[in-house]
Amino acid sequence: MVSRPHGGRLVDRTVSDKRRERLREEARELPAIRLTAGLAADVANIAHGVYSPLEGFMLQEDYLSVLDEMRLSNDLPWTIPIILDVDPGEIAGVREGDDIALVYNGKPIALMRVEEIYGWDRKEYAAKVFKTTDPAHPGVAKTMKRKELLIGGPIDLIEDPPEPFERYRLWPKETRVLFKARGWKTIAAFQTRNVPHLGHEYVQKAALTFTDGLFVNPLVGWKKPGDYRDEVIVEAYQALIKHYFPVESVVFSVLRMEMRYAGPREAIHHAIVRKNFGATHFIVGRDHAGVGNYYGPYEAWELFREFPDLGITPLFVREAFYCRKCGQMVNEKICPHPEEYRVRISGTKLRRMLLEGQRPPEYMMRPEVVDVVLKHPNPFIEGDEAFQE
């Protein structure tokens, strides 16, 4: 059976066509908050149940509970605060209990009932969510630029923000129907922000050997400089699945959600989100959602063990490498040969090779995937554009 939604019910804050027109009219008369691309994505994810059981942006009780306990105030596991930050001037005259319009690209995309307005300590947030206040950490840097106040309350979606990859996007309601239609009872979800190399493929196929289906769900949205562009990731996975997977065993769908680079906390968050899509298992790799050397390579595994009530089974798959003696991708549990035979796949080294127009060897990356990356004149996000929203 597909997994039960987190909290037991799949949230739906979308509205009927008739009500949508009424809300659109109301929005014209309401105070407006302009959203970044990341916040607009959060609105859509709340409305479509990706963030179930959340019905809106967090109130202070839940916010503090998540920061301190990694649980909502009702004790349900939740590790990343879902918050809406505003400047005092933006909500001048707005009182608790008022409705506001949430605007993206000049259009109202949702209405929100402001149930609470409260302050927050950005440094405390960084220390607890990222386990560091180092401004070199991309999540910390982004957090410190956020606004002074938080507002919490339920939202009603008027329309989804524009999605360039609409043809590749499925919402939880849709994936659940699709998984059931395929007769899948066990589904392994794979989170990624990268173009696939053979280490990823090894892990995915290992999971697929003992589940009914694989759900590949890459993040599109804000990422740090040096990460792959969204379109490169999508095209690369299309090539990999077409040439190297039984297509009836894989569902591919993009998820518009910002990377936070919060390591172990974000790994739990990624698992909860995929549980809402219907996945029963979640692949947890080496240094999941990590960046630099801020987190231990298997620190996320330890955190998962603190959440026996998560409701989705983590799959801990060790780092894969190519063994010249074995002649294939293996991991340290199944390869008896010494380090001299082992070729470890470095994401940094792969990026450098691709950036220089070199083709990585076929034991590192499939040629069809290399073709996709090299056809793009600039497959990686550059410094300034990472902060443009």
Swiss-Prot record:
The enzyme's E.C. designation: 2.7.7.4
Catalytic activity: sulfate + ATP + H(+) = adenosine 5'-phosphosulfate + diphosphate
Pathway: Sulfur metabolism; hydrogen sulfide biosynthesis; sulfite from sulfate: step 1/3
GO MF annotations in UniProt: ATP binding; sulfate adenylyltransferase (ATP) activity
Alphabetical keyword list: ATP-binding, Nucleotide-binding, Nucleotidyltransferase, Transferase
GO terms, biological process: hydrogen sulfide biosynthetic process; sulfate assimilation
InterPro entries, per database record: ATP-Sase_PUA-like_dom (IPR025980), PUA-like_sf (IPR015947), Rossmann-like_a/b/a_fold (IPR014729), SO4_adenylyltransferase_pro (IPR020792), Sulfurylase_cat_dom (IPR024951), Sulphate_adenylyltransferase (IPR002650)
Pfam families linked: ATP-sulfurylase (PF01747), PUA_2 (PF14306)
Alphabetical list of NCBIfam families matching this protein: PRK04149.1 (NF003166), sopT (TIGR00339)
Family, per entry: Belongs to the sulfate adenylyltransferase family.
HAMAP family from the UniProt entry: Sulf_adenylyltr
UniProt protein name: Sulfate adenylyltransferase
Gene: sat
